[in-house]
Amino acid sequence: MRLAAISDIHGNLHALHAVLADIATTGADLTVNLGDILSGPLWITETAERLMALALPTIRGNHERQALAPDIAAMGASDAFAAERLLPNHRAWLAALPATLQLTDELFCCHGTPGNDLVYFLESVDAHGMRPATLAEATARAGDAQQGVAHGVILCGHTHVPRALQLADGRLVVNPGSVGLQAYDDDHPHPHVVENGTPHARYALLTRRSAGWQVELRAVPYDAEPAARLAQQHGRPDWAHALRTGFVVETAQAAAPIRPVTSRA
């Protein structure tokens, strides 16, 4: 079996097209979408229509939950931009998405962790910024294999950082990274930035071999300039810079007490 995992598209239709084209060359049997699909200053309607037509196995992320809340005025800028443009059929589609998905007997999908769409699975944030999670931290988030998620492979998203980690009990946790946005800053639970260092669209390709699962964290080139220009037109120069470079602007970098982890695919 060969599986493509995509996540965190954030309305970047051009990056999505590039990733889907690359997936088509790999012979993947199935593609799964791990959420955070539309929120951002880009192509909301067009991305929704493209994905609804594909009918991929899909879960919701925190941004789907947030963008469907009733009070648009209380939303962050990215969710509000999406919420104002969602058509009724888009809302119905997003509302029907599950928070987690058992894709096969071996494969389990979540956005953040199995129990929380806002928690980073393979990274941790403290007063010093963001760092890779320890094995103990990741294992705690996965839960006891006997009582919680016992599947051999757990797919997650949310952080935009492509990474794979095998737990001591043999379970494999894979984050494919983000299709649509390669850098951002956040202040929860502490100020930190995430930077992948290039504008490439990310996804993961998993292939079942006799010895276990082979994981490829793929970085796909695409022309990010139209997305950057659109973000700029919609009043988001921070997104424009991140889309062009894979880095946050210097003012956001200065907000993190220690230089964050940079993942380069």
List PLM regions with ranges.
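Active-site-proximal beta-strand elements of phosphoester/diester hydrolases
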Residues: 1-10, 106-113, 173-177
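Core catalytic region of metal-dependent phosphoesterases/phosphodiesterases
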Residues: 2-95
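Active-site environment of divalent metal-dependent phosphoester hydrolases
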Residues: 10-15, 39-42, 64-69, 102, ...
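His/acidic metal-ligating clusters that form di-metal
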Residues: 26-27, 86-165
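Structural motif
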Residues: 30, 57, 153, 171-173
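Redox-cofactor binding/interface segments in oxidoreductases and associated redox assembly factors
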Residues: 33, 156, 175
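Generic beta-strand structural signal
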Residues: 33, 102-103, 166, 208
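Acidic, His/Gly-rich catalytic cores of divalent-metal-dependent hydrolytic chemistry
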Residues: 166-265
